[in-house]
Amino acid sequence: MSEYKLIAVDMDGTLLRSDKSLDPDTIRDVEEAARQGIQVAYSTGRAVPELEAYVRQLPCMRYAVALSGALVYDFQERKSVFCQMLSGAYIEEIVRVAAQYDAMAHFLTEDESIVRIDQVSQMADFHMGIYQPMFLKLTRKVDDMRAEAKRFDAIPKVNVYFRSAKDRAAGYEALKRLPLSFAFAEGASLEMNAAGVTKASGLRALTKHLGISMTETAGIGDADNDRAMLEAVGWSVAMGNGAEDIKALCDAVTEDNDHNGVGKAIRSLLTIKSL
């Protein structure tokens, strides 16, 4: 019997293949963990609407640590069990900096994804082309993000998709004075949450809800925005396609996301064998 009661799994670059699909073998391995009484939870920067298609394929994954830790959501009860917002006072400044670099701002609430209508067709320019079909289908599209920003007293998460990693670095320099949590993701994305919010803080909220300890959790991820979660869990696994510094901090390294790395890690955990 595994000593771990919860496995937190990143999505993009980890649970999902490069084409954003689920490997049937991964589905079977996650289902086997569930049959053995282990919760497998999403740990993702995505919003709840962006998870629904995967939840239909993996109904055994009841919980999500979503919005990079700002939201913990229960898909069985269809409600949030934890949410931490960033102040609306910072949203307009984020949008201003995004406009300065001709970047794409993205507001994420508990139940909505909001973007500027004319930028969705240009997502490849922001290194986000793989997500364009999802954004076309699931986002609420507005004409003016500055006007939209004024509607919010608080919001769980704001992303900015830059045209280059160089622009992202400059945008971060302009924004880092704000009391927020920052994470780099994808090719040139900057993710922002309230100060102290990380995938680790969201996972702690979930473990509290479930009545288990962080030492009884495992985590699987590939990128900088998984770092805090991987450092906090009892057993950490990096994907074979992950960043080298992420591999260096983890307890083990599995296969890449196109070769069922998550499933291999889960099987290792269930059988208590090393990867």
Pin down the residues of each PLM region.
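Short, structured coil segments at secondary-structure junctions
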Residues: 58-60, 67-68, 76, 176-178, ...
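Short active-site oxyanion
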Residues: 37-41, 61-62, 156-157, 215-216, ...
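Mg2+-dependent phosphoryl-transfer enzymes with acidic/Ser/Thr/Gly-rich catalytic loops
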Residues: 2-6, 17, 23, 190-275
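Anion (oxyanion) recognition and catalysis
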Residues: 31-35, 99, 176, 231, ...
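Conserved acidic, metal-coordinating active-site core of Asp-based
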Residues: 89, 97, 101-104, 108-220, ...
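Active-site phosphate-binding/coordination module
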Residues: 21-128
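Hydrophobic packing residues within well-ordered alpha-helices of enzyme cores
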Residues: 51-55, 171, 246, 262
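Non-catalytic pre-domain segments flanking phosphatase-related domains
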Residues: 1-11, 28
